[in-house]
Amino acid sequence: ALTAGAAETAAPQRIIDIRTDDISLILSAAPGEEIRFLHFGGRIDDPAPLAGYRSYRHPDHNTEDVAYPAFGGRNYHEPALRVTHADGDLNTELRYVSHTSKQLSDKNVTETVVKMTDCCQALDVELVFTAYARENVITTHAVIRNREKGPVTLHSFYSSSLPLKADKYLLTHLYGAWAREAQVDHTLLTHGSKSIASTREVRTTHTENPAFLLTLNSDSFSETYGEVIAGALAWSGNFRLNFEVDEFDVLTVLAGANPNASEYRLRPGETFTT
């Protein structure tokens, strides 16, 4: 008797390397799979070994860090994208298609576009990362394209999702009111969610400022030492910054338009840029 077996092998991962002079943002993906978020922090000159990284978490429990989590599949956390499809379907599962990277006319600036599509519906999403080398700044936004036969309703459409791994997270942000602007608030994040948000349209900075600092691996704020990540929304309007620490101590930061009363009907053939 002959017994034959075949081992299931994962598709080869493609590294998406976005970098400035001193920092790296690294993703990995294979066609038809979710885009995994591997690293944001100090620059990694050779990211190739990260292609084989596995978290050894159970995939059924939604514990892999993904680049742009959508409402659907096994995502149980706050989604970056939540839509109602033309046929009423609420499920969205984004899968990698391709990516391109090019240097813009200013050679200090590199633009990387990562293309995704829903596993079942004709809905496309592009993540656009623009890296400014000397300034050590990476901007990101999403472009949503409707190829379905009817309108798609957008409920949540954040500009970015950033998973971070550290032992502690100290959040610093500014708030205020008339005659007492720019008050400083420090919050040590615990498991669960915290949001900084505004629905005051163009008057957002009168109360909550759409920017933040995150001190990693420390519960005290210092202006002279430590690892700090800064983020800001580069536009005025209703916004929400959502900070969610999960059971594995991973912090996911969502930044973008406030989902409150923000539904948008995207007609067939139209695109929406966050």
Task: List where the protein language model places each region.
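Boundary at the C-terminal end of the N-terminal hydrophobic targeting segment
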Residues: 4-12
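Polysaccharide-binding surfaces and accessory modules of carbohydrate-active proteins
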Residues: 13-18, 23-26, 33-244, 260-262
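Short, structured beta-strand/loop micro-motifs enriched in basic residues and often containing a Trp
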Residues: 248-260
